[in-house]
Regions:
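Structured alpha/beta or helical-core interaction and ligand-binding surfaces enriched in interleaved
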Residues: 1-185
């Protein structure tokens, strides 16, 4: 049975973060990948966001992301020639999107300026700096996330979420799936 370990991360004095690692429950602790991982992550992201609006930020391999979204009729917004913002699609489309692009590093945001429309400054910085652009911006949001699903990793940068709250949010949506959610000792 896969494990979803959720714990606070120490990324420095100015960054509050929660790390989520989806790994096999064995001595090797290899990342869980493939359809099962996409099914789990597609439930975790919206659950972490709760009632806050959620978007995905892609800042590499833009042509492939655009083509996938067009083929699957997933709405998106090209914010710069090198970045695409995807408002969180319905569950099955989100799962397909995460399955297709789990080998890429991309981002997600919830709350904050999303409700007001867009955050052009951050979106330009994402195109230029990738996930590093979230560091100065995350306090404006409910969370900013770095999705490294190939490595079984999701890092939530947030001043509003802590590990126990993330566990409380994700446990119910993962019931019925073969995964154990825990705070490592």
């Amino acid at each position: 049975m896969p494990l979803l370990d959720i714990e606070p991360l120490d990324l420095g004095p100015d960054v509050k973060a929660v790390g989520l690692d989806l790994v096999e429950d064995d001595e090797n602790r290899e990342p869980v990948r493939g359809e099962d991982a996409a099914r789990i992550w597609s439930r975790v992201l919206p659950a972490a966001a709760g009632e806050e609006p959620l978007v995905l930020d892609f800042f590499s391999h833009i042509d492939r992301v655009r083509d996938f979204c067009d083929r699957h009729q997933i709405g998106y917004r090209e914010t710069t020639p090198r970045s695409i913002v995807i408002p969180a699609p319905e569950a099955s489309a989100l799962e397909a999107l995460l399955d297709r692009f789990q080998g890429e590093t991309f981002g997600a945001r919830a709350g904050g300026p999303i409700s007001a429309g867009d955050d052009g400054e951050l979106e330009r910085e994402l195109a230029r700096r990738g996930a590093d652009a979230y560091h100065p911006a995350f306090p404006r949001y409910f969370f900013c996330a770095i999705c490294g699903f190939e490595d079984g990793s999701l890092v939530l940068l947030s001043q509003k979420l802590w590990a126990s709250e993330v566990i409380r949010r994700v446990r119910p949506v993962l019931q019925g799936l073969d995964v154990e959610v825990r705070l490592p000792a």
